[in-house]
Amino acid sequence: MTDLTAQEPAWQTRDHLDDPVIGELRNRFGPDAFTVQATRTGVPVVWIKREQLLEVGDFLKKLPKPYVMLFDLHGMDERLRTHREGLPAADFSVFYHLISIDRNRDIMLKVALAENDLHVPTFTKLFPNANWYERETWDLFGITFDGHPNLRRIMMPQTWKGHPLRKDYPARATEFSPFELTKAKQDLEMEALTFKPEEWGMKRGTENEDFMFLNLGPNHPSAHGAFRIVLQLDGEEIVDCVPDIGYHHRGAEKMGERQSWHSYIPYTDRIEYLGGCVNEMPYVLAVEKLAGITVPDRVNVIRVMLSELFRINSHLLYISTFIQDVGAMTPVFFAFTDRQKIYDLVEAITGFRMHPAWFRIGGVAHDLPRGWDRLLREFLDWMPKRLASYEKAALQNTILKGRSQGVAAYGAKEALEWGTTGAGLRATGIDFDVRKARPYSGYENFDFEIPVGGGVSDCYTRVMLKVEELRQSLRILEQCLNNMPEGPFKADHPLTTPPPKERTLQHIETLITHFLQVSWGPVMPANESFQMIEATKGINSYYLTSDGSTMSYRTRVRTPSFAHLQQIPAAIRGSLVSDLIVYLGSIDFVMSDVDR
C-alpha cells in the first residue's frame, strides 16, 4: 500500500492495485466488474458500468472507513483522444472523485458513454453536492443526469446554444459570427433572468400570507462579486434561497485546450485572483508529474515562501472585509497597509504584484534577488504586532461576536456532504489540511500547526481559524528565511529548461529541440495527472489529461468556492437577511474562483 507521505517520485505511473479499496471492490462486485486505469494522478482510477454507478457509490460510502466526500464530478469529450489503450470504448466520460478522510485516500470512478446515449443516473441521491457539478457537466458537455432535481444551465445563460467543452464547439471568438444585441435579444435575455419560484419548487405564499422574493445582487456590495442570490422571505426570515452564479465565467478550462503547457500559467493566477502564486502551484505540480520532473530543494522552498506570502495577503483581506460586513470600517484600512508591504516584497522578488505568473514548469522564473531576506525579515518583525491589534480592536468585540457566533452553523456531516474544505471543514473538528495530510512542495519539512475548531463551524469560528492560520504562515516564512537551500532555481530537464551552452555547441539536435519547444511548446507524454493543494479558500486542484501534444487535451479546475456557495441554502434557511450578509463574509470566496 502506498504511503502518501513517502518520498517516491510523484510522477510515477501507477495502477494502485495494491490500494485496499480495489480489493474491497473486487470482493463485492467481482474481479472483472471494472477496468483499472494506470495514471499519474496518484489515486486509483476505476472504470465502471453506468448501471453499477449508484451501487458502487453507495458501497464506497458505507465502507468501515467510508468515502464520505464527493470532491469533484465532471466530464470529458473522448472523441478526439488518440491514446486510450486498454480503456473502455467511449465518446464521452463522466468522472466521480471521492475522498475518504479516515483513510486519507481518494478514488476516481469513471463511466464511459456513447454519443447517442448521453445519460447517467444522478449522484444527488448519495451526495447532495453533486447537484451543481451535474448541472455544470450538462451545461458544458450536454450529458443528461436522469433524476436530477433541476437540470438547467449554471455557467452559461439560459438562452445559450450548444455545450462549450465539446471538442466540436469553437474555442475562439473569431470562429463565431459578430455579436449583435438587438432590442428583441435584450428583452429575451431579461426575461430569461426573471426568477420563477415554481421552477425551483418554491411556493409564492401560504393560505394566510405571500412570500416576498428579493434579488440580492448581482451588484450588491455584500455579494462579494457578480453574484445573485434570490431570497424567499417571510418578513426578514429566509425561508429558502437560490444562488445564481456564472456571471464571471470566462471559459478557463476551454482556454487550457488552446494554450501551450507553459502559456497557460498566467491564466491560473486569475482563477482566484487574490491567491497569486498559490493558484500556480497545483497546475505546475500536475504538469511536472506528466513530464516526470523532480525540482531542486531550493525551488520547493521558494514556492512555499511565495505561497504563504499570498496566503497571508488573502487572509488579511478576508478578515478585514468580514469585519467590515459586520459593521466596522477601520480594520480594512489597516489591512491594506499590511497587504501593501506584502505586495512590495512580492514585487521585489517576482517583478509583479497580484498576478506574478512566476512559477515555471520545473522551477521558478528566476532566482531570488539580492536583499529579499532583509525585506522578509522586516515584514516578519512587523506583522505579529499588527495581528494582535486586529484581535484586540475588532475580533474580540462583543457586538461582532454577537453578530457571528452561532450564525450559519453546521457540523462535520454537513460539511462533508457539501464538499466543504479549508477553514469551514476544519472548524467542524476535522483535521484535514493538504499541506499536512498530503504534503507537496516540501511542506513535510516545515514545522507548523493546523488550527482546528471544536465541532461546529459558525461564522466566528471560521474567521478565528483564519487568524491562527495567519500566525502559522508566519512560522513557515520564518523557516524559509532561516533555511533557504542553495542550488539551482530550475530543474535541468529538456521539457522545461534550455540546454547548457556547452552542450549545444557539441550537439546541434539539442538546440533544434529547444527551438521547437519554445516556438510550439513542450510535448508532454500522454497520461493523466492530478494535484490538489491547500489554497487560500480551501482545496484547489488541477486534473490534466495529455494526449501527447503541446496542449492539454482536458484541463479540469476544481475550486473550493464553487462547493462553498452551493452550501448556502442549507446553512442559512431560517436565518435573517442580516445573518446572510455575515455568512457570505465568513465563507471567503471570490466569483472568479466560483465561475472560472
UniProtKB/Swiss-Prot annotation:
Q: What class of enzyme is it?
A: translocase
Q: Where located?
A: Cytoplasm; Cell inner membrane
Enzyme Commission identifier(s): 7.1.1.-
Q: What Pfam families is this protein classified in?
A: Complex1_30kDa, Complex1_49kDa
Keywords in alphabetical order, please. Answer: Cell inner membrane, Cell membrane, Cytoplasm, Membrane, Multifunctional enzyme, NAD, Quinone, Translocase, Transport, Ubiquinone
- UniProt superkingdom: Bacteria
| A GO cellular component entry from the record | respiratory chain complex I
**Annotated region NADH dehydrogenase I subunit D: where?**
210-596
Q: How does it sit in the membrane?
A: Peripheral membrane protein
Catalytic activity, reaction form: a quinone + NADH + 5 H(+)(in) = a quinol + NAD(+) + 4 H(+)(out)
InterPro entries registered for this protein in UniProt: NADH_DH_suC (IPR010218), NADH_DH_suCD (IPR023062), NADH_Q_OxRdtase_suD (IPR001135), NADH_quin_OxRdtase_su_C/D-like (IPR037232), NADH_UbQ_OxRdtase_30kDa_su (IPR001268), NADH_UbQ_OxRdtase_49kDa_CS (IPR014029), NADH_UbQ_OxRdtase_CS (IPR020396), NDH1_su_D/H (IPR022885)
Q: Which GO terms describe its biological process?
A: respiratory electron transport chain
Stretch list, region NADH dehydrogenase I subunit C: 2-186
The terms under GO molecular function for this entry are: NAD binding; NADH dehydrogenase (ubiquinone) activity; NADH:ubiquinone reductase (non-electrogenic) activity; quinone binding
Q: How does it assemble?
A: NDH-1 is composed of 13 different subunits. Subunits NuoB, CD, E, F, and G constitute the peripheral sector of the complex.
Q: Which HAMAP family match?
A: NDH1_NuoC (MF_01357), NDH1_NuoCD_1 (MF_01359), NDH1_NuoD (MF_01358)
Name the job this protein performs.
NDH-1 shuttles electrons from NADH, via FMN and iron-sulfur (Fe-S) centers, to quinones in the respiratory chain. The immediate electron acceptor for the enzyme in this species is believed to be ubiquinone. Couples the redox reaction to proton translocation (for every two electrons transferred, four hydrogen ions are translocated across the cytoplasmic membrane), and thus conserves the redox energy in a proton gradient.
Similarity remark: In the N-terminal section; belongs to the complex I 30 kDa subunit family. In the C-terminal section; belongs to the complex I 49 kDa subunit family.
Name of protein: NADH-quinone oxidoreductase subunit C/D
Record organism = Escherichia coli (strain K12)
